[in-house]
Amino acid sequence: MQQFKWINILKGFAMGTSDLVPGVSGGTIALLLGIYNQFIASISGIFSRRFWPSFTFLIPIIIGMLLAMGSLSNLFNYLLSQHHIPTMFFFGGLIIGIVPYLLKISNYKTSFTTKHYMMVIAGIAILIVITLMNNGDKHAGETLTLSTGLIIKYFIAGMCASSAMLLPGISGSFMLLVFGVYGTVMLAISEVVKLNFAGLPILLAVGFGVLAGFIISSKIIQYFLTHHKLITFALIIGFVVGSLFAVFPGLPTNIVMWFVSLVVFIIGFIVSLTLGRITAENE
């Protein structure tokens, strides 16, 4: 029987933290921590005979993710608004640092053919297109009221965000930006944490969409990981590389910002590279 693993709360916390940042994927962090395949299989198996082991694995992950989103939403609102460039450089370092790990576990030198490299290019192109689709969040935080049309919009946004969250390289929060609801959702989270429940209907609409997206997309991803593993990994590598385009905030504007941005970029790269090596050694 699958046992409750307390360490998975920390892994879920790391995934939830990354999903607060537009352009950074919780799926990428799951890969880096060596739990991606089991995470997808558990979500896919939650409505099957594998319910209990799937449920037991997912509970600490979900607890960690909720803790991260509840405790860090205000911090990331501050960092992204006041220190945007250094923050995004740090996550850019994390993303680049995972690429060697992905190449190693896919054994690309001997396994990849022309079609696999074409899938890598396709993944990069898809992320660039998604990034260019971003229409911002111009009305974020202006209101927490809902209409029937907005309920449908938040549900669809949540569904697409959770589907994206499961794919390394595609950020769930970035998909919320594409739909123009990221800022409002972040405001709703921060208000609910303060026990102001005016934003709760928004979170429920998004939450039900997230649940639907998880159920549907996990089964699709699980199928491709099982039956077309190399092609899927090639696409994932493309997504991860392409996500650099999504997180690039522009160049620093002064020497101090250049220094800070480069330092945190290197820190992010080293952290990601080290975790990737540890995960690869333990597989």
Where are these regions (language model features)?
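Long, contiguous hydrophobic alpha-helical segments, chiefly transmembrane helices and signal peptides
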Residues: 31-33, 166, 170, 217
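A short N-terminal beta->alpha junction/helix N-cap motif
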Residues: 1, 27-31, 63
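Transmembrane alpha-helix interface/packing and boundary motifs in multi-pass membrane proteins
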Residues: 14-24, 159-173
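Generic hydrophobic alpha-helical membrane-span motif
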Residues: 25-29, 129, 174-175, 274
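Generic N-terminal helix/loop capping motif
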Residues: 16, 20, 24, 32, ...
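Juxtamembrane transmembrane-helix boundary motif
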Residues: 2-14, 55-56, 60-163, 201, ...
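Interfacial segments of multi-pass membrane proteins
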Residues: 19, 28-49, 172-198
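Short juxtamembrane and helix-loop transition motifs at transmembrane-helix boundaries
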Residues: 21-24, 45-54, 80-84, 132-141, ...
